[in-house]
């Protein structure tokens, strides 16, 4: 697990390719991340499925409740089958763009 902190955003990258252990690590250390916008980068793990992504919903809901963004980066999945409550994009650049847009929406009171 690689953690990169830039400004108001933390990017957590799965470096081992084992989604279950990665999810456990992120869940255990979520308390230290919940005051920041979070990007979960699973782009290097080609075995991630939509079922795996659904396991991230509780973390996403916690961040949304705290008025912070939670974006998942994943490739090779069916984006139409992803739950609407979860923001999933194909690249880290798009994840940063989503966070910037959500920050603007929050600043405007939406």
PLM regions and their residue ranges:
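Alpha-helical scaffolding segments of alpha/beta enzyme cores, especially the outer helices
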Residues: 54-58
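Short, glycine-/small-residue-enriched flexible loop/hinge segments at domain edges that mediate gating
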Residues: 23, 27-53
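A charged, well-structured terminal subsegment
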Residues: 96-110
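STAS-typified acidic loop motif
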Residues: 1-27, 44
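Flexible, charged surface loops at secondary-structure boundaries
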Residues: 4-6, 31-34, 63-65
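Short acidic-hydrophobic, aromatic-tinged amphipathic segments that line or gate anion-handling sites
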Residues: 87-93
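Hydrophobic beta-strand segments of well-ordered beta-sheets in folded domains
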Residues: 8-9, 35-40, 67-71
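Short aromatic-glycine-(Arg/Gly/Cys) micro-motifs in beta-strand/loop hairpins
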Residues: 60-82
């Amino acid at each position: 697990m690689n953690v990169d902190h830039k400004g108001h955003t933390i990017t957590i990258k799965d470096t081992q390719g084992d989604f279950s252990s990665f999810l456990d690590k992120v869940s255990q250390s979520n308390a230290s991340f919940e005051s920041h916008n979070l990007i979960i980068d699973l782009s290097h793990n080609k075995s991630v499925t939509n079922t795996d992504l659904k396991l991230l919903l509780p973390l996403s809901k916690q961040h949304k409740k705290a008025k912070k963004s939670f974006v998942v980066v994943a490739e090779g999945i069916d984006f139409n089958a992803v739950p609407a409550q979860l923001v999933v994009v194909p690249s880290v650049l798009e994840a940063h763009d989503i966070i910037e847009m959500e920050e603007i929406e929050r600043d405007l009171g939406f």
